[in-house]
Amino acid sequence: MRLDSMQFVDPHLFLVDDTDPNNLMCTADITEALNGVLGDDIEKGNFNLLVRFEDYPAVQEIRLVDGDCEPPATAGAPWVCTPSDSSPAVLLGLEAVDDPLCRDIDPLVYAADSVPMLNDPGQPCMRTHRGAFSLAISGSVGALDLREAQFVASLDDAVAPTRLVSGLLYGFLPQVSAENLTFELPIYGPRSLWSVIDVPVCQDLYPTLLPSIDTLQIKDTLAPGVWLAINFTAERVVIQPAP
């Protein structure tokens, strides 16, 4: 399956006017602008993340891999994708989920206003073991180096699934990783991901969404960063082997 939608839900991202370093100004919530960039990348085939797995419910693991994909020639037909050899697949083992709902988040690490917007997958579903992995979310943004992360989604049918619905990717993104991710916003220009997350000047304007900075013990270090959550869906594609 190929991800056909993706939206940043938390943290919200804010643009700061730093023309005068002594007078920083909170300009705008640009979360939807970034989501527009993500959506354009997917729609145009510039970003193709494939979710590959065996027949449900016998599936034990999923593979997340970049693909080279072509849009369908006729409306309603599936995309045609070839798994890419340019980057290694992310192999994630699955854990059993007996509860009716499948995500396993701590809502207290997210903004209260964002929690109702997070996808809440139900059965039948797949949930990966919690762990550390690096996953590209866009050709424009790059790969997120996540800790304590999980990939969760419902299937539209337990026997012959054609879609992943109500998907949620969540985990902790360390500051050092977010600082190395740069994306281009229309009008606003290039920004590092961390520069639109760590925005204390915006807190008074958006008190129910900020602050979003947190910490996580990583080995012997209490690392600053942010807990993030991304909604997604995926659709079945035709897999074409590489020539």
Residue ranges and their predicted role:
Residues 1-243:
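Extracytosolic secretory-pathway proteins
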